[in-house]
């Protein structure tokens, strides 16, 4: 009994010898609750309606009162749960363990009624402690378990929160206590009393070795659930339904697993006698041995035979299961629930493996019922379960991803395919073949041990042998072939059918344009019929890919050989007729061929439809078949999709019929028919005359038209894919709008009279009035709710006092003498009338938005609310890592960023002027009251003037006195308008206020009962709110917070004592060399403050190790999920908000789960087939993005979220396609926690953790709904960088999802309409972005090939009225006009595809806010260039997915939540966006430049805009980018950024950027020198060689081919009449231009290396910058060489501009390919430090040890690539800066630019920063210096560009015809014949040049 002073604990509860437990009181023992002090002061009836000064203020909820301590809680319902050190915790001796006394001293006699110290109080309201006890310190302290258990009689000790055991209530004869779980009160009705439940828990702890704290936590968890259910049904029904949900019901995961894994057969006949499927050799041997053993034991055999004689079908097993469940006693049901919860509550990472927990529970349950367990006397040691069962599994998980290096855990360099993740481990338990793999060191199997003995043997299992990969998440594009095979089938099949029919020239022998001869009819049919073979080929590829990803050894893998055989047969059937028609048409008659062709076509059509509709998993004998038990696990866990019924099903069919109907019609007429003429023209076209290129055969030149045609068809195919997404967006939007009218959420349904009927609707829809005992007039009840809403808005400073007066219900004298009546505000009537809009609240204000949405939403259909007493309990769960809790004064009123021009407070005042005004008035009233209280005299007239001046500080910073209570008000005002945790918590605590308000309004008898005692009334309301609503923040870093964070958290806890905080507590290792011990701990505002400023935790549960193994967020949620309470969880991010009027609807929202009413039928009645209703797993809610309207970027981000979270969610939920639980969704607690938790957590793979919860829910049979009448606020990113970080995170996360098994299950098993909904809502969006960017690139490639063709040919005179058989004039011309028309159509298509993203936003605004709001918002968007941002975002998305699928490296990117007002330096922006966008944009712009000079058409203007967007968006959306001074200061920074980092290391430098972009391919060396470098770098594993090969070698090589071919063609000298002309040597020319710089750079590098080695060490002593100077010279030479080579190209092309541009495009592609080749194939891994780079320039290699031998060679190759890249970056950076010059020269451009970015009027603009004199002078000097440099560079660049053009026009040329290097200008080549002679001349071509065009015109 050490540690407990004797005599303190008698008879199981403790006496307070020291006059009470002071921490529940303040020092003076005064009253705990002062109604004027707390935020809910409007519950005080006396002052309720008096809104004139005084009472109504409540100061923002009363938290500003600095003296507001946590002693406010007078009601003692809250148990601390740990008053003294717990039993064995910090190394106490064994004797201290409570288990010793507990187990042996059980005495049933202590249960007599006269000793009911634990207060089974009755349900009346008079059970508060008598006032005689108040203030005396009898504080109802309830000792924690570790103390209670020493009590002599009652030994339980687990009744965790006994909320309120004051002496007055607990002593016999005194008033009864308030129950913690009132609905589970101990009257005769409960099947098991809570004391018995407690005993069950203690018994289980002693038998299995669970932790005490975990037991107390889970006891509270179970009791809260029972209480929650029993409040709306009988206790017996509550227990039964809970048991059915967890263990035995049709929807219980445990029951489904039990039958899926054939454990009914194991229980019946044993594993040895089961017929099992495939297994490896080792397992087969083990099976044989087990069978032999069974045969040796004849008694067992008889039993087995007896059992086998019985019926082992699934039906019989289900019957046996139900009867077993039916016979179970309530006590046994509770025991099973308790055991399951205890297993789950300590399972750490194993909670991600639901079937593994089921297995553990099954073993434990079998063991419990065994004689061995029942006869145990000694309790099992605490922590046994954790250490023996969970920790080995945890360690296996952790070791998959981490290894120990120097005593620290370091991430292994493994990609997902090598990591056995949570899902692989979990899937071992799906099939009996998996379970039988579980064996011990001695190779015996766990399944050969009798079930009852398995638990004790579980600790000896060798898990390493058991687990294996069940799905390979190989990083590859081939996943898409398998997962989305039906998308390829539908699109490629339809495209083939359309195109083949319209391309007869491709299969017409000797086609002649003047004859327009057609192919035979059979060929028409058969050519189209080949589409069936194409579709079959896709399916064959999909099956082969599936073979790669699903290991054959997994029992759930489908048999693919049979399917493959079938598919090959189908392929042959679809191919053979075509081969006959085309190959044997000479042998067979045309009639037979025609019949074969027609049959071929219909076979193809049938194949196409069959493969389009049938899921891949359902082909030819699938495991989707319902009969047979072999694959029941895969059906259960991956294909239990809830069926769509009725309207939903028809809506789903309707949507997709509309989408594809419209798509196919439009694609046929717009895309296919527009390609018909180009195909007819280009396919037979031959180049007539062609001198060709040296070393290259002439056939290339002649085939240019066919190459172009191939590229055009590919381009058409990409547009064909894009069309589908376009129509999906349009149709989805139409369906969504139709549904919004149906629900009444649109403002275009005025017949609903949303305002005039609002009071009636509040009465009928928000209040549960049917069960009210005392009936009041509706107006009395409505007025209380309405006034509460208005006052809450007033408190939040949204409404001024005069607005409030107009909006409140007022008491006025009535006609009857002495009576008073309520007068309703005129608002309800006049608000419908548009002319009165501004009378009640400021136009366009937050208050208007909130009231309008509230009125609108209660007009929609809502479930009827239950009374508060009967509503279910729910928890709000908020994960928090490092987000701002509360803004500090320093952050608000000083400019933090060196580049920012505004303080946060200034900016917020600009954004919310009206709210700031209300706040200031409020503060002044408060200050005046304070000064009057302090006895200051009244002011006279003269003082009034002075006070105006004195009030200035209020308007500037919100306070005049620096007293904390005033500064805190300003901090809170700002925090409530930024994205802070404080805003989130204060918003979601409105649930508590709403519940109290509803309870008070609906139960007037409660108010009457307490008479005038508002303190007791408030206590009763608090009790109810606390019982029904919990809020828990998971602050994993809480224990490591700094002082400021700790203070802010403490402030939160004092403001909201019911706020629970779960955090990770760390203890140093007990022994040297061990790991530190980690605990999940929980505190709240009632917990005792310790001396170190921390609070004493209520629960502290030890973990197996560090739980943060993944990307953080999901692990953070997982460790705190054990502290959720009740039936539902609302998952919230730390940047959200909620409002009182929304919280009032919570009962209707929870009713959407369809669990509030249950039939009184037992789910366990055997023989009766219960109709399994699919449970609702997730309920989505709307989001209002409160960061909209803070400028263009914030608004774009907000509009995206709004349309996705509301507009699309509305239809997707309806048609079963919604997966996301975007936050603020509600989750079904039991459903989700028994199926792997609320998110997944494998590092990298589950980066977008929340969507996996949605996919799991869908696959496992849960429905996902969307609720239209409830919305929370949410913040979004506001700055360019943070929005794109978020975009990158989503994009890379999507790349990871493509690899995931969930996509495989959904893609290969969903029915067609559901599959399409899933595809287009999730992966389709990202693939669409990739197709958009692919189409842009393809279009540019088509344009350069077309440009080359047009440049070298003469275009025919075109007349669209003439028939196509008319001869072309002039003869041998090229008929390119239809091709130019096709180009224009493509531009239109791509343009529409980009702009379709604005349609949902426009429609959303139109339906919900009206035409004017839509017009203004869109006008603002377009006026702010948001379309350029859209193009850029599209590229970032596409790049993120592409990079991730190639290289991986997905990681959580923390996104900024702050306001983006700071200017970011050019160098930083360039390095961040060069790789993803600027490089690609500049390559495409070069191509566009060539196209513009050869095939100009006005439609290309759109491409100039969109491609410029890819390059300049980062700078265009950078605040103050065009401020004159800042621009040149920035230029200075850019020059420094380029040059630094070569003599000493610098993180922000060009060389650091260059090395970082290399490491993707090379990876880092594993040797960690000293401290591992930044987190970002360590997580990047080296990409797989095959991935590097395809994306870094093959892709650039293709780029070389598609740019080199047109370059060689344009230099082929076509149209030469003279046959003796020599071919030009374009190959050597391009080689000189491409390889020249590389050679020079290599020479320079080698030479400088020698210089550095010889001179570096000597010069380094005196000249510190020797290395930097050497590097600068080398880099300068590289730049000069690049500029020289540009001129050389110009010169060698005889000053021809188009040829030079195309030559540079081609040379750049070749150089890029060479550099990628060097980096991919020749470079070894990179060091994390950059010593070798510095050594190269300084010659100091001796620091590098042995590496100084290997590194110089590697560094030489690096330098070759670096110099090449540097020269490109230097030139490109300057060009970008020059492009900004025109904008820079516009007067007042900075003001205009800021208007665009921040949407602030020029009058409210942000002032320029103020500098000291010294700073100003320095800045001016720098500006002058660097402006001179900038303009010098500009002039130099212009000279280099213009000089050659002048030389050409002047006719200056040098005939330098060595090796025919010079390209003749060939301006006069023309071999067309103007006069037409003869007929049937072959169509030929000749070269055309600008001058030739004029000649031939």
Curated annotation (Swiss-Prot):
Signal peptide: none annotated. One of its GO terms (cellular component) is plasma membrane. One of its GO terms (molecular function) is 1,3-beta-D-glucan synthase activity. The keyword Transferase applies. It is a multi-pass membrane protein. Keywords: Cell membrane, Cell wall biogenesis/degradation, Glycosyltransferase, Membrane, Mitochondrion, Transferase, Transmembrane, Transmembrane helix. SMART domains: FKS1_dom1. GO terms for biological process: (1->3)-beta-D-glucan biosynthetic process; cell wall organization; fungal-type cell wall polysaccharide biosynthetic process. It holds the Pfam family Glucan_synthase. The keyword Kinase does not apply. Disulfide bonds: none annotated. Residues 1-106 are annotated as: Disordered. The chain crosses the membrane at residues 487-507, 525-545, 564-584, 591-611, 655-675, 707-727, 728-748, 1329-1349, 1386-1406, 1473-1493, 1497-1517, 1588-1608, 1630-1650, 1666-1686, 1701-1721, 1766-1786, 1826-1846. Residues 74-83 have a biased composition (Low complexity). It catalyses: [(1->3)-beta-D-glucosyl](n) + UDP-alpha-D-glucose = [(1->3)-beta-D-glucosyl](n+1) + UDP + H(+). Residues 8-29 have a biased composition (Basic and acidic residues). It is an enzyme of class 2 (transferase). Component of the 1,3-beta-glucan synthase (GS) complex composed of a catalytic subunit fksA and a regulatory subunit. Belongs to the glycosyltransferase 48 family. This is 1,3-beta-glucan synthase component FKS1. It comes from Aspergillus niger (strain ATCC MYA-4892 / CBS 513.88 / FGSC A1513). The lineage of its organism: Eukaryota, Fungi, Dikarya, Ascomycota, Pezizomycotina. The gene is fksA.
């Amino acid at each position: 009994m050490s540690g407990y002073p004797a005599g303190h604990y008698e008879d199981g509860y403790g006496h307070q010898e020291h006059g009470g437990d002071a921490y529940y009181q303040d020092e003076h023992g005064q009253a705990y609750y002062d109604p004027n002090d707390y935020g809910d002061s409007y519950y005080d009836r006396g002052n309720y309606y008096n809104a004139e000064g005084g009472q109504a203020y409540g100061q923002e909820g009363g938290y500003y009162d600095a003296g507001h301590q946590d002693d406010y809680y007078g009601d003692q319902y809250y148990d601390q749960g740990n008053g003294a050190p717990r039993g064995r915790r910090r190394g106490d001796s064994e004797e201290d363990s409570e288990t010793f006394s507990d187990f042996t001293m059980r005495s049933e006699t202590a249960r007599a009624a006269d000793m009911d110290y634990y207060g089974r109080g009755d349900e009346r309201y008079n059970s508060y402690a008598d006032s005689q006890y108040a203030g005396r310190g009898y504080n109802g302290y309830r000792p924690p378990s570790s103390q209670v258990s020493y009590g002599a009689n009652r030994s339980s000790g687990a009744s965790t929160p006994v909320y309120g055991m004051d002496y007055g209530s607990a002593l016999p004869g005194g008033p009864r206590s308030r129950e913690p779980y009132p609905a589970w009160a101990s009257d005769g009705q409960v099947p098991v009393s809570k004391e018995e439940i407690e005993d069950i828990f203690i018994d289980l702890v002693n038998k299995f070795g669970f932790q005490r704290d975990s037991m107390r936590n889970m006891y509270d968890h179970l009791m809260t659930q029972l209480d929650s259910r029993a409040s709306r049904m009988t206790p017996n029904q509550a227990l039964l339904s809970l048991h059915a949900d967890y263990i035995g019901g049709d929807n219980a995961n445990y029951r489904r697993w039990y039958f899926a894994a054939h454990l009914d057969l194991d229980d019946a006949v044993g594993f040895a006698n089961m017929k099992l499927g495939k297994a490896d050799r080792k397992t087969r041997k083990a099976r044989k041995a087990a069978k032999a053993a069974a045969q040796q034991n004849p008694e067992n055999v008889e039993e087995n035979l007896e059992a086998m004689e019985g019926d082992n079908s699934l039906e019989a097993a289900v019957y046996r299961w139900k009867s077993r469940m039916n016979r179970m006693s309530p006590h046994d049901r509770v025991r099973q629930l308790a055991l399951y919860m205890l297993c789950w509550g300590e399972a750490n990472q194993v909670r991600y493996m639901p079937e593994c927990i089921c297995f553990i529970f099954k073993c434990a349950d079998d063991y419990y019922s065994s004689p061995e367990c029942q006869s145990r006397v000694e309790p099992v040691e605490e922590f046994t379960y954790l250490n023996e069962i969970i920790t080995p599994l945890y360690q296996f998980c952790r070791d998959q991803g981490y290894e120990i290096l120097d005593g620290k855990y370091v991430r292994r360099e493994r990609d997902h395919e090598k990591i056995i993740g949570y899902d692989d481990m979990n899937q071992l338990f799906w099939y009996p073949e998996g379970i039988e793999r579980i064996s011990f060191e001695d190779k015996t199997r766990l399944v050969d041990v009798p079930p009852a003995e398995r638990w004790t043997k579980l600790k000896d299992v060798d898990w390493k042998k058991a687990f294996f990969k069940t799905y390979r998440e190989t990083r590859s594009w081939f996943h898409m072939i398998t997962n989305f095979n039906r998308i390829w089938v539908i699109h490629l099949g339809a495209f083939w059918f359309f195109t083949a029919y319209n391309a007869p020239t491709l299969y017409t022998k000797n086609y002649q344009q003047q004859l327009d001869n057609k192919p035979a009819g059979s060929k028409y049919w058969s050519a189209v019929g080949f589409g069936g073979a194409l579709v079959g080929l896709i399916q064959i590829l999909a099956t082969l890919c599936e073979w790669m990803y699903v290991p054959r050894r997994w029992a759930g893998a489908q048999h693919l050989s049979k399917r493959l055989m079938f598919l090959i047969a189908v392929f042959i059937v679809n191919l053979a007729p075509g081969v006959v028609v085309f190959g044997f048409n000479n042998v067979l008659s045309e009639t037979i061929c025609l019949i074969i062709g027609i049959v071929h076509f219909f076979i193809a059509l049938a194949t196409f439809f069959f493969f389009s509709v049938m899921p891949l998993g359902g082909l030819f004998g699938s495991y989707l078949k319902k009969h047979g038990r072999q694959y029941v696990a895969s059906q259960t866990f991956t294909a239990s999709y809830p069926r769509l019924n009725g309207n939903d099903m028809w809506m789903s069919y309707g949507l997709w019929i509309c989408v594809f109907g419209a798509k196919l019609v439009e694609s046929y007429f717009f895309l296919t028919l527009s390609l018909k003429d180009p195909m007819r023209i280009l396919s037979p076209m031959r180049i007539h005359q062609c001198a060709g290129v040296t070393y290259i055969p002439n056939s290339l030149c002649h085939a240019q038209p066919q190459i172009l045609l191939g590229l055009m068809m590919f381009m058409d195919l990409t547009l064909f894919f894009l069309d589908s997404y376009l129509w999906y967006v349009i149709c989805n939007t139409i369906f969504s709008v139709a549904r919004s009218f149906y629900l009444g959420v649109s403002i275009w349904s005025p017949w609903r009279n949303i305002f005039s009927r609002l009071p009636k609707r509040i009465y009928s829809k928000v209040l549960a009035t049917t069960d009210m005992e005392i009936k009041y007039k509706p107006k009395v009840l409505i007025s209380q709710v309405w006034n509460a809403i208005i006052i809450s808005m007033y408190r939040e400073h949204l409404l001024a006092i005069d607005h409030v007066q107009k909006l409140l219900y007022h008491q006025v004298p009535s006609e009857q003498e002495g009576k008073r009546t309520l007068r309703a505000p005129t608002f309800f009537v006049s608000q419908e009338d548009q002319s009165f809009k501004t009378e009640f609240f400021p136009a366009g204000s937050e208050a208007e938005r909130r009231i309008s949405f509230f009125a609108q939403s209660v007009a929609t259909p809502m479930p009827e609310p239950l009374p508060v007493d009967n509503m279910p309990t729910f928890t709000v769960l908020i994960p928090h890592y490092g987000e701002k809790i509360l803004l500090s004064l320093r952050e608000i009123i000083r400019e933090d960023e060196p580049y920012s021009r505004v303080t946060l407070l200034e900016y917020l005042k600009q954004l919310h002027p009206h709210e700031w005004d209300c706040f200031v008035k409020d503060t002044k009233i408060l200050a005046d009251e304070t000064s009057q209280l302090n006895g200051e005299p009244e002011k006279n007239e003269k003082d009034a003037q002075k006070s105006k001046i004195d009030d200035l500080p209020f308007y500037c910073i919100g306070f005049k006195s620096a007293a904390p209570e005033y500064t805190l008000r300003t901090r809170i005002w700002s925090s409530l308008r930024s994205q802070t945790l404080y805003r989130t918590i204060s918003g979601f605590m409105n649930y508590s206020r709403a519940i109290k308000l509803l309870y008070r309004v609906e139960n007037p008898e409660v108010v009457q009962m307490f008479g005038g005692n508002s303190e007791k009334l408030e206590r009763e309301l608090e009790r109810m709110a606390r019982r029904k609503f919990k809020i828990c923040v998971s602050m994993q870093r809480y224990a490591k917070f700094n002082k400021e964070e700790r203070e802010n958290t403490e402030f939160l806890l004092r403001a909201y004592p019911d706020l629970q905080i779960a955090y990770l507590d760390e203890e140093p290792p007990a022994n040297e060399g061990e790991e530190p011990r980690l605990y999940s701990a929980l505190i709240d505002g009632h917990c005792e403050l310790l001396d170190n400023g921390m609070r004493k935790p209520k629960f502290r549960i030890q973990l197996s190790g560090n739980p943060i193994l993944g990307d953080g967020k999901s692990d953070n949620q997982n460790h705190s999920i054990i502290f959720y309470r009740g039936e539902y969880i609302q998952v919230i991010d730390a940047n959200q908000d909620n409002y009182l009027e929304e919280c009032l609807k919570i009962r209707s929202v929870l009713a959407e789960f369809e669990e509030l009413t249950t039939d009184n039928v037992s789910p366990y009645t055997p023989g009766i087939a219960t109709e399994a209703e699919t449970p609702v797993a997730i309920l989505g809610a709307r989001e209002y993005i409160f960061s909209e309207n803070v400028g263009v970027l914030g608004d774009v981000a907000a509009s995206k979220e709004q349309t996705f979270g509301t507009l699309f969610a509305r239809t997707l939920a309806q048609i079963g396609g919604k997966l996301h639980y975007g936050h603020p969704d509600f989750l079904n607690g039991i459903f989700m926690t028994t199926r792997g938790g609320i998110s997944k957590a494998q590092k990298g793979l589950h980066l977008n953790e929340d969507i996996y919860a949605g996919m799991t829910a869908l696959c496992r049979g849960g429905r996902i709904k969307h609720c239209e009448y409830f919305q929370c606020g949410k913040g979004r990113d506001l700055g360019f960088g943070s929005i794109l970080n978020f975009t990158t995170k989503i994009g890379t996360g999507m790349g990871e999802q493509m690899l995931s098994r969930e996509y495989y299950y959904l893609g290969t098993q969903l029915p067609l309409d559901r599959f399409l909904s899933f595809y287009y809502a999730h992966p389709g969006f990202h693939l669409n972005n990739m197709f958009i960017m692919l189409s842009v690139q393809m279009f540019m490639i088509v344009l350069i090939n077309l440009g080359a063709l047009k440049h070298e040919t003469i275009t025919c005179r075109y007349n669209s009225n003439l028939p196509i058989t008319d001869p072309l004039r002039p003869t041998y011309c090229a008929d390119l006009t239809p091709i130019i028309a096709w180009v224009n159509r493509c531009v239109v298509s791509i343009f529409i595809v980009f702009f379709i993203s604005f349609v949902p936003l426009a429609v959303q605004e139109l339906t919900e806010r009206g035409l004017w709001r839509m017009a203004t918002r869109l006008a603002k968007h377009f006026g702010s260039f948001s379309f350029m941002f859209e193009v850029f975002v599209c590229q970032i998305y596409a790049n993120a997915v592409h990079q991730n699928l190639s290289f991986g490296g997905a990681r959580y990117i923390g996104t900024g939540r702050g306001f983006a007002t700071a200017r970011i330096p050019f160098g930083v922006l360039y390095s961040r966006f060069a790789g993803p966008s600027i490089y690609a944009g500049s390559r495409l712009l070069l191509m566009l430049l060539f196209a513009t000079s050869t095939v100009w058409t006005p439609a290309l203007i759109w491409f100039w805009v969109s491609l410029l967007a890819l390059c300049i968006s980062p700078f265009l959306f950078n605040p103050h980018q065009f401020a004159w001074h800042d621009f040149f200061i920035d230029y200075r920074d850019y020059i420094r950024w380029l040059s630094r980092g070569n003599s000493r290391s610098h993180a922000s430098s060009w060389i650091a950027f260059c090395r970082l972009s290399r490491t993707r391919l090379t990876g880092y060396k594993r040797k960690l020198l000293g401290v591992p470098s930044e987190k970002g770098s360590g997580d990047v594993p080296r990409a797989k060689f095959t991935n590097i090969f395809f994306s870094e070698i093959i892709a650039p090589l293709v780029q070389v081919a598609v740019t080199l071919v047109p370059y060689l063609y344009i230099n082929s000298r076509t149209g030469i009449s003279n046959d003796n002309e020599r071919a030009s040597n374009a190959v050597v020319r391009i080689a000189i231009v491409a390889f020249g710089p590389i050679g020079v750079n290599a020479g320079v590098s080698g030479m400088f290396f020698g210089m550095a080695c010889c001179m570096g060490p000597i010069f380094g002593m005196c000249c510190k910058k020797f290395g930097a100077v050497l590097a600068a010279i080398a880099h300068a030479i590289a730049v000069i060489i690049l500029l020289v080579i540009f001129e050389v190209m110009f010169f060698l092309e005889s000053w021809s501009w188009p040829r030079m541009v195309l030559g540079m495009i081609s040379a750049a592609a070749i150089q890029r390919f060479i550099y990628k080749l060097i980096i991919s194939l020749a470079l070894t891994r990179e060091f994390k430090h950059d010593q070798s780079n510095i050594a190269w320039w300084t010659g100091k290699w001796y620091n590098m040890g042995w590496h100084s031998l290997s590194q110089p060679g590697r560094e030489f190759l690096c330098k070759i690539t670096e110099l090449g890249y540097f020269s490109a970056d230097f030139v490109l950076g300057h060009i970008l800066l020059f492009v900004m010059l025109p904008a820079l020269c516009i007067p007042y451009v900075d003001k205009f630019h800021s208007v665009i970015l921040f949407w602030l009027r020029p009058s409210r603009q942000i002032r320029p920063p103020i500098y000291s004199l010294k700073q100003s002078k320095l800045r001016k000097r720098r500006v002058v210096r660097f402006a001179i440099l900038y303009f010098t560079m500009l002039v130099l660049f212009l000279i280099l560009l213009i000089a050659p053009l002048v030389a050409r026009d002047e006719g200056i040329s040098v005939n330098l015809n060595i090796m025919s290097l010079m390209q003749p200008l060939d301006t006069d080549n023309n071999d067309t014949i103007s006069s037409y002679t003869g007929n049937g001349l072959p169509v030929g071509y000749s070269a055309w040049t600008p001058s030739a065009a004029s000649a031939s015109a």
